[in-house]
Amino acid sequence: MTEPTIHKGLAGVTADVTAISKVNSDTNSLLYRGYPVQELAAKCSFEQVAYLLWNSELPNDSELKAFVNFERSHRKLDENVKGAIDLLSTACHPMDVARTAVSVLGANHARAQDSSPEANLEKAMSLLATFPSVVAYDQRRRRGEELIEPREDLDYSANFLWMTFGEEAAPEVVEAFNVSMILYAEHSFNASTFTARVITSTLADLHSAVTGAIGALKGPLHGGANEAVMHTFEEIGIRKDESLDEAATRSKAWMVDALAQKKKVMGFGHRVYKNGDSRVPTMKSALDAMIKHYDRPEMLGLYNGLEAAMEEAKQIKPNLDYPAGPTYNLMGFDTEMFTPLFIAARITGWTAHIMEQVADNALIRPLSEYNGPEQRQVP
């Protein structure tokens, strides 16, 4: 009898087809519906990219206006959801709050069990609109601050920052945040997206699939890496009065020592990209803009030193989480909120995959090879 080939972690397995995004490891490129992600980040708003992922094409002016009006009118946090968040301890991880909030949003949605294309699109749009209120309120309550209501006169990114910090962000900060949302929006069959598709394949509802995806994203091998990057910076020590070169020298020495001790350093390497994450140059430009805006050269020094030491020792390049972590830190987000920010962006990709799965569904049920004891009698 021929032994089956086992693909641990489903490595190298093509599970299905998708028209949503294409990750090309050979050319280190990422396309959303055929468009290079770096071009979308340079020319589009996050709202336009969300529309693209869900509807296959970029919106025209009237389509964008209708979409923006819907998003802005569905931002407010329902009292039931706020109440559920308030029941959770501020000692729990924000990912637990995010998972719970999405579950409550699903339970309260009038079309919760309706998986028609129209209902799923409406639920996806509503979730995109409301989730920033969850993240912003959770950060504020952990600081002992009150909820800030959304503003319909601000776009998605500007409003997100307003609800979190209580002041209008500078245009360059809004743009950097917008870029990060676009870059995190979608990335093919990653662990959380595949989780969402598996759940959807059982004919479970959209919010159940997103809740499961959040559970997958909580793991440090998937979504927690941007938090881990900041923990590395904090372990090295962030000294605001330090020069770029001084910070680089310290961080490079830290990395050399960490690699000698065979420590796992997050923010480097990627399961798909072997020659560098295609999203990094665009996100690094956003980080550079934030370093200039806030006059924080020591952050660039820490970044450069770690990157150089890893390249020299292992020839491993950064992934998206590496520049994203310090970017969010400079904006003022608490480190533990970084992965919920990932959710805010990836809701678009997850729900696009959920709708694609529903449209051509087959229950995802792989086989396993048993390696336990042979059949035996109970004594």
Swiss-Prot record:
Coiled coil: none
InterPro entries according to UniProt: 2-MeCitrate/Citrate_synth_II, Citrate_synth-like_lrg_a-sub, Citrate_synth-like_sm_a-sub, Citrate_synthase, Citrate_synthase_AS, Citrate_synthase_bac-typ, Citrate_synthase_sf
Pfam families documented for this protein: Citrate_synt (PF00285)
Induction: By growth on propionate, but not acetate or glucose.
Pathway: Organic acid metabolism; propanoate degradation; Carbohydrate metabolism; tricarboxylic acid cycle; isocitrate from oxaloacetate: step 1/2
Transferase keyword on record: yes
Active site as annotated: H222, H270, D321
Binding site for CoA: K264, V265, M266, G267, F268
GO-annotated molecular function: 2-methylcitrate synthase activity; citrate (Si)-synthase activity; citrate synthase activity
Entry EC no(s): 2.3.3.5, 2.3.3.16
Keyword tRNA-binding part of the UniProt annotation: no
Record-linked PROSITE patterns: CITRATE_SYNTHASE (PS00480)
Transmembrane segments: none
UniProt catalytic activity: propanoyl-CoA + oxaloacetate + H2O = (2S,3S)-2-methylcitrate + CoA + H(+); oxaloacetate + acetyl-CoA + H2O = citrate + CoA + H(+)
Thermal profile of function: Optimum temperature is 31 degrees Celsius. Cold-active. Is rapidly inactivated at 45 degrees Celsius, and shows significant activity at 10 degrees Celsius and below.
Biological-process GO terms, alphabetical: carbohydrate metabolic process; propionate metabolic process, methylcitrate cycle; tricarboxylic acid cycle
Residue sites binding substrate per the record: H187, R279, R346, R365
Keyword list, A-Z: Transferase, Tricarboxylic acid cycle
PANTHER family linked to this entry: CITRATE SYNTHASE (PTHR11739), CITRATE SYNTHASE, PEROXISOMAL (PTHR11739:SF4)
Purpose: Involved in the catabolism of short chain fatty acids (SCFA) via the tricarboxylic acid (TCA)(acetyl degradation route) and via the 2-methylcitrate cycle I (propionate degradation route). Catalyzes the Claisen condensation of propionyl-CoA and oxaloacetate (OAA) to yield 2-methylcitrate (2-MC) and CoA. Also catalyzes the condensation of oxaloacetate with acetyl-CoA but with a lower specificity.
Assembly with partners or alone: Homodimer.
Recorded family membership: Belongs to the citrate synthase family.
Name assigned to this protein: 2-methylcitrate synthase
Organism name: Antarctic bacterium DS2-3R
Gene: gltA
